[in-house]
């Protein structure tokens, strides 16, 4: 599993996909952080991470589209399967490589609440819980992308499927609101697939307070 992990991690940074993912993620997080927290003085970092959840729909499909689909297309998956490692170990090694790339920008934004604290009172517990929720949410999105990459040999199809599933999760709250009149049972079932609202509920309104 360790060999698979190292191989995948190196391949992502050699192809610059890893660098691109980190750069785009940090750019948008930094942009929202600068506008909401530094320029306007909102003390809640949760509002920043909940505002950039849309980014998963764009970055995760690109990050995960080749992770298993390329192996199937080039038939190298057959070679890997003959290696002295279980299928679960192969999948876990690839997943941990993806998770490591995602963990880099998450580790960097852990310093953002400390920067905010230099300008006023900041609810640190809430800030770091929101970062944890953001990380767990990213893990879920990456796991979805990894699974969908395993069902096709085409990287494009894998990326499109991942985008559609994440987009459906992003829109699920709106869909549930539209069809709520059809019955509570259907609405409750659909809300099981609502990937985004749980994170949005953790962030208070930016009008709830200012750094002072």
Predicted features, each with a name:
Residues 10, 14, 70, 88-105, ...:
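Alpha-helical transmembrane segments of multi-pass membrane proteins
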Residues 29-36, 45-48, 55, 97-158, ...:
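Secretory targeting signals
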Residues 201-204, 208-211:
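Single conserved hydrophobic/aromatic residue that forms the stacking wall/gate
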């Amino acid at each position: 599993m360790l060999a698979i992990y190292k191989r995948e991690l190196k391949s992502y940074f050699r192809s610059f996909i890893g660098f691109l993912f980190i750069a785009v993620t940090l750019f948008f997080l930094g942009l929202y952080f600068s506008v909401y927290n530094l320029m306007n003085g909102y003390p809640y970092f949760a509002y920043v991470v909940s505002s950039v959840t849309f980014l998963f729909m764009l970055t995760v499909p690109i990050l995960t589209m080749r992770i298993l689909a390329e192996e199937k297309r080039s038939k190298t998956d057959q070679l890997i399967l003959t290696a002295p490692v279980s299928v679960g170990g192969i999948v876990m090694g690839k997943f941990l490589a993806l998770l490591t790339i995602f963990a880099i920008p998450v580790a960097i934004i852990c310093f953002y609440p400390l920067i905010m604290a230099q300008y006023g009172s900041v609810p640190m517990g809430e800030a770091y819980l929101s970062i944890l929720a953001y990380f767990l949410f990213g893990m879920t999105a990456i796991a979805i992308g990894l699974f969908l990459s395993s069902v096709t040999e085409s990287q494009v199809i894998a990326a499109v499927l991942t985008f559609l599933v994440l987009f459906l999760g992003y829109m699920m709250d709106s869909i549930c609101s539209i069809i709520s009149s059809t019955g509570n049972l259907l609405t409750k079932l659909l809300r099981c697939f609502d990937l985004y609202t749980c994170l949005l509920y953790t962030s208070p309104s930016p009008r709830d307070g200012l750094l002072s």
